[in-house]
Each structure stands twice: as C-alpha cells, then as structure tokens.
Amino acid sequence: IKPVDMYKESKALIIVAVADEVCAPMCPDCKIPMHKHGTRKNKFSDTPLYMEPVRLEVQRPRFRCESCGKMAMPELSFLDDKRRATKRLVDVIRQQCLGTTFRALADQTGVAVNTVKNIAHDLIDELEQTVCYETPVIMGIDEVNLAGGYRCVITNLATNNVFEMLEQRT
C-alpha cells in the first residue's frame, strides 16, 4: 500500500492509503477470472504515532465472480488474522499487556478495552502451552478478599511468587 494523505480526527490520526494495483484473481469455486467490482474503504488500527492512536484507512479494489457472485478483496499481509489491526500493533499490545492496565493500554493505542483483553487472553493461552510450572518446595496457603469474595492463594515461599489463585476459599 502507498500512503497518500494524513489528517487528524477527534481521537486518532488517520493515514489514508491505497492498495497497489493487482490483477484480477481467480474465483476459488469456479476457477474463472473475477472482474473488478468497485472499491471499499476499510479502517485498521495501527501503532501510535506522535503519542496518538493511528487508524489506517485503506482503499482496496473488490472483485466479483460473474457466475457464482462470490466477492473477494486482495489480502494485506501486515494485518492480524483475528482483528482489524496490524500485526505490529498486536505485538506491541502483547509486549505491554502484562505490565500495565488494559484501560491505559486501550487509551494509548485507541482500541477497545475488550480487544486488549482478548489479545492478553490469547497471549496467556499461548504461554500456558509453553511455560512449565514447578511445584513449590515450600508452599504457603492464605486467603484474600478480592472482587467481593474470598479466594484461596497458594504461594511458592522459596521464590516469593503466587503459584495459584483459586476462585473460592477451598
């Protein structure tokens, strides 16, 4: 893509870009060439610039199959598969989400708090697959009143770390 314009909106900096010219793709179902069917503007979140959230406004061509009516747009390799954001923004959020609050990170990047939370959950799920937990040599058990109820906290006293926090006292 090529950036062509930049302007300030109320809460974000908008970078307008156009996609590079692409030849008409083949229909995945019919195996015949698709024809051009107008353009579409899409907005994607990107990493902050000048301490302001950034939105990429990308204008992409759309293609349509004449026989089956299926629509297609060229894929952008820098976008995340799950979200309307760039891969580098998702990487920045993954690096910072465990060290700062979700609200502060959402305000800084201009995405919703739930988006930050979902990225953090994906990171935690990934870490649970790769990180190996050791059983504490010296175990401490206590309870804490958190979020309106008592919870059981199991700690590793040898390393002064929380090993597990259970939903209830028992």
PLM regions: where:
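Residues in the recognition helix of alpha-helical DNA-binding motifs
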Residues: 96, 108, 119
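Residue-level detection of the helix-turn-helix DNA-binding "recognition helix"
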Residues: 32, 110, 121, 125
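RNase H-like nuclease fold core
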Residues: 118-170
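Short coil turns linking two alpha-helices in DNA-binding domains
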Residues: 101, 112-115
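Short, Lys/Arg-enriched anionic-surface-contact patches
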Residues: 69-89
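Short, amphipathic alpha-helical "recognition" segments used to contact nucleic acids or chromatin
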Residues: 86-100
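Short, conserved DNA-binding cores of transcription-related domains
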Residues: 1-76
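Mobile genetic element proteins and their domesticated derivatives, centered on retroelements
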Residues: 15-16, 27-30, 65, 93, ...
